[in-house]
Structures are given as structure tokens and as C-alpha cells.
Amino acid sequence: MTIDRIYPIFTVRWLAIHGLAVPTVFFLGSISAMQFIQR
């Protein structure tokens, strides 16, 4: 029963981290690409 309580929290936390990390990496990559093209 303890695993059932911890597992959903870990899954939501994992999805939240990746949901924020993926757009952040894409945003930083696009900014670095624009700066590289301008130079």
C-alpha cells in the first residue's frame, strides 16, 4: 500500500519535471541557434 501512495506522486513529479525541461531545452536551443546565425 505504501508503494501505491508513493508511485503516483513520483510519476506526477517525473511528468512535471520533463514537461518543464523539454520546452526549456528547446527554448535555450532556439536562442543559441539565433545568436549563432546572427554572428
Swiss-Prot record:
Membrane topology: Single-pass membrane protein
Pfam families: Cytochrom_B559
Annotated cofactor note: With its partner (PsbE) binds heme. PSII binds additional chlorophylls, carotenoids and specific lipids.
Function: This b-type cytochrome is tightly associated with the reaction center of photosystem II (PSII). PSII is a light-driven water:plastoquinone oxidoreductase that uses light energy to abstract electrons from H(2)O, generating O(2) and a proton gradient subsequently used for ATP formation. It consists of a core antenna complex that captures photons, and an electron transfer chain that converts photonic excitation into a charge separation.
Superkingdom of the source species: Eukaryota
GO CC terms: chloroplast thylakoid membrane; photosystem II reaction center
Species of the source: Ephedra sinica (Chinese ephedra)
Cellular location(s): Plastid, Chloroplast thylakoid membrane
Cofactor: heme b
Protein name in the entry: Cytochrome b559 subunit beta
Entry keyword Phosphoprotein: no
Family of the protein in this entry: Belongs to the PsbE/PsbF family.
Amino acids binding heme: 18
Regions crossing the membrane: 14-30
One Gene Ontology MF term: electron transfer activity
Main location: plastid
Keywords: Chloroplast, Electron transport, Heme, Iron, Membrane, Metal-binding, Photosynthesis, Photosystem II, Plastid, Thylakoid, Transmembrane, Transmembrane helix, Transport
The gene coding this protein: psbF
A GO BP annotation: photosynthetic electron transport chain
Subunit note: Heterodimer of an alpha subunit and a beta subunit. PSII is composed of 1 copy each of membrane proteins PsbA, PsbB, PsbC, PsbD, PsbE, PsbF, PsbH, PsbI, PsbJ, PsbK, PsbL, PsbM, PsbT, PsbX, PsbY, PsbZ, Psb30/Ycf12, at least 3 peripheral proteins of the oxygen-evolving complex and a large number of cofactors. It forms dimeric complexes.
